[in-house]
Amino acid sequence: MAKSRRDRNSWGGFSEKSSDWSSEEEEPVRKAGPVQVLIVKDDHSFELDEAALNRILLSEAVRDKEVVAVSVAGAFRKGKSFLMDFMLRYMYNQESVDWVGDYNEPLTGFSWRGGSERETTGIQIWSEVFLINKLDGKKVAVLLMDTQGTFDSQSTLRDSATVFALSTMISSIQVYNLSQNVQEDDLQHLQLFTEYGRLAMEETFLKPFQSLIFLVRDWSFPYEFSYGADGGAKFLEKRLKVSGNQHEELQNVRKHIHSCFTNISCFLLPHPGLKVATNPNFDGKLKEIDDEFIKNLKILIPWLLSPESLDIKEINGNKITCRGLLEYFKAYIKIYQGEELPHPKSMLQATAEANNLAAVATAKDTYNKKMEEICGGDKPFLAPNDLQTKHLQLKEDSVKLFRGVKKMGGEEFSRRYLQQLESEIDELYIQYIKHNDSKNIFHAARTPATLFVVIFITYVIAGVTGFIGLDIIASLCNMIMGLTLITLCTWAYIRYSGEYRELGAVIDQVAAALWDQGSTNEALYKLYSAAATHRHLYQQAFPAPKSEPTEQPEKKKI
């Protein structure tokens, strides 16, 4: 039900608000607080607290309202939660001119503190969703999200990428919180994290994300670019400019960022003062914060959260309600819980992999060129023993070449790439053996010679057994001779036309097994292997008849 109340809130001052509350959850504002909805476990897996999300996003007052999701992300210990609490003050007191509150009032809301260790983990959402009237009279729900800082000492790169990407995918306004400047590594990390988010989303011709705001804290160069949005716009234009004299890598980073976000802006914020930075007991009282910071803070927060600045969350051009946002939250986290996406890698690991793969490619290419000189297409047949000797020598040279290349990652990291090189060289050697054998005139004639021998033997046996009256054996030999003759003609056609090459390979394998000078067991094994490998070809060539009664063996004629 709707309630109008004048409450003393924890951010200082009285405010009169009209809010919708479900009959099940009539709680005063002061009991609202941060709720962790994305939990990063000790094993670096992710868990979504669906029950908490349901309570927040499916309350009767907001579930069918279009939602504005505001998120703050960036490196850890850079004041994200501190900033979020000033956003809360504004949301609770925005109708008041002096919304920042009493100068002696401690700052409360999302948990924050000074120091060097992380405070926020996962993703936290403020438990009260604010209902705000936009300029066109439409009432929208505003959701505030605080995120775990990136690159702390307890998180993997995948943890940081997932939290940043997920918050960017869910939010309609993403505040990228940076300290002192926008450096090239900040842009590269943004490129990595947004690409990790784009991978998890459906492909679309639209830009996947909405508003990105670079918030540069502790800005120390107001004489170059003034504090605020105007100075930030000029600064960002220069920083994200793509020019022809830039390296291709730098151009790609900037093009990628522009391709991901519909709106990109920047705000330059001064340092809050030495008392804030050095006092271990600082609790957020405005009286201890520099006036220049407070002055620009009063500009920044309304610039972000005033009704005309709110961007309704859209996905593929469709406006999303709180109910819909809940479903997207569930769908996205399932993707990151699985193994469908590649794990992001550190710059060292990615460089080391590229380094080792390049060394593998160089060594493999060297082996290939030397083998081509020995038994390439225009070279004559080489004795198998000589070919094997050359192979072993060149393989050893390639391994030495790989070991001699300076590679990042160390010996242990390079070991699996050495194994990969040896495996790929062995595969190439098998291909060279086949290529070399094809030049042997006796090898090329093996199949027709074998089939001719089979035809001759079965012809002789059929003649002898027919002469002495063993008609069944004679008929069987005649049948084998006929099938062999058909096989020979088929093989000749395949060699001439180049069609049905797989069937030709089967015939060659069977002939090779019959030709084999080794033991009978080896020949039978080769026959069995050929049959098992190409069984589907036999089934296509000789389809089994549909259920018919078994024919009785042909009786001997009297």
Swiss-Prot record:
This is Atlastin-1. Changing H258R: Loss of GTPase activity. No effect on oligomerization. It comes from Rattus norvegicus (Rat). The chain crosses the membrane at residues 450-470, 472-492. Residues 471 are lumenal. Residues 521-558 are annotated as: Autoinhibitory domain. The gene is Atl1. Atlastin-1 (ATL1) is a membrane-anchored GTPase that mediates the GTP-dependent fusion of endoplasmic reticulum (ER) membranes, maintaining the continuous ER network. It facilitates the formation of three-way junctions where ER tubules intersect. Two atlastin-1 on neighboring ER tubules bind GTP and form loose homodimers through the GB1/RHD3-type G domains and 3HB regions. Upon GTP hydrolysis, the 3HB regions tighten, pulling the membranes together to drive their fusion. After fusion, the homodimer disassembles upon release of inorganic phosphate (Pi). The keyword Acyltransferase does not apply. Residues 64-309 form the GB1/RHD3-type G domain. Monomeric and homodimeric. The homodimer, transiently formed by two molecules on opposing membranes, is the active form mediating ER membrane fusion. Interacts with REEP1, REEP5, RTN3 and RTN4 (via the transmembrane region); these proteins are involved in endoplasmic reticulum tubular network organization. Interacts with ZFYVE27; both proteins are involved in endoplasmic reticulum tubular network organization. Interacts with ARL6IP1; both proteins are involved in endoplasmic reticulum tubular network organization. SUPFAM superfamilies: Interferon-induced guanylate-binding protein 1 (GBP1), C-terminal domain, P-loop containing nucleoside triphosphate hydrolases.
